[in-house]
């Protein structure tokens, strides 16, 4: 069951070939990163979403879904510890990811986060009673807001469009 004859296999040279995407440059230079990190706006909302982008960056490119699911109980011995939501239900590749809570991360948490109680989410977007559809909508909204503010910052700094996809 589940085995096909070699003659029926649809993939390979001269048969169906899976197209590879054209790569695009996603990296930022150290100079560009410094400009983003140093950027200050008079608009508090812009600063908030820039800080969330920096949080994502400093947490090894944490997925926004995972970032919004983080609780204070996920901070253990000065490290944020989590399993990617994308892989948490698989038995293989269920690797715990760790990010050191640097002074910059701690500043972002202190400035924009909830009260530091173990059961509290770090950031005030999830409440804990949302349905899967509501959680997805919250994540989509936060990503949209981060991307909107980072696009403005990127334009102002002459970097171009900066997004959560890093």
Question: Where are these predicted regions, by residue range?
Answer:
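Short, basic (Lys/Arg/His-rich) helix/loop patches that form interaction surfaces
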Residues: 42-44, 137-140, 144-166
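Feature representing long, continuous alpha-helical segments
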Residues: 34, 57, 65, 80, ...
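Proline-centered turn/helix-capping motifs that create local helix->coil transitions or kinks
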Residues: 2-9, 113-119
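Basic, Lys/Arg- and aromatic-enriched nucleic-acid-binding interface segment
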Residues: 6-64, 68
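Catalytic-site neighborhood detector that most strongly recognizes the C-terminal catalytic loop/helix
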Residues: 19, 27, 84-90, 129
């Amino acid at each position: 069951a589940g085995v096909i004859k070699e003659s029926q296999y649809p993939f390979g040279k001269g048969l169906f070939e899976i197209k590879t995407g054209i790569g695009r440059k996603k990296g930022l230079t150290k100079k560009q990163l410094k400009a983003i990190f140093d950027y200050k706006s008079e608009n508090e909302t812009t600063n908030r979403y820039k800080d969330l982008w920096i949080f994502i960056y400093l947490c090894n490119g944490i997925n926004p879904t995972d970032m919004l699911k983080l609780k204070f109980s996920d901070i253990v011995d000065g490290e944020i510890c989590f399993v990617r939501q994308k892989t948490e239900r698989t038995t293989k590749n269920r690797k715990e990811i760790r990010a050191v809570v640097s002074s910059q991360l701690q500043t972002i948490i202190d400035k924009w986060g909830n009260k530091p109680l173990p059961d509290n989410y770090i950031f005030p977007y999830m409440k804990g009673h949302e349905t899967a559809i509501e959680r997805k909508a919250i994540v989509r909204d936060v990503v949209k807001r981060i991307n909107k503010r980072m696009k403005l910052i990127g334009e102002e700094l002459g970097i171009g469009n900066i997004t959560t996809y890093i």
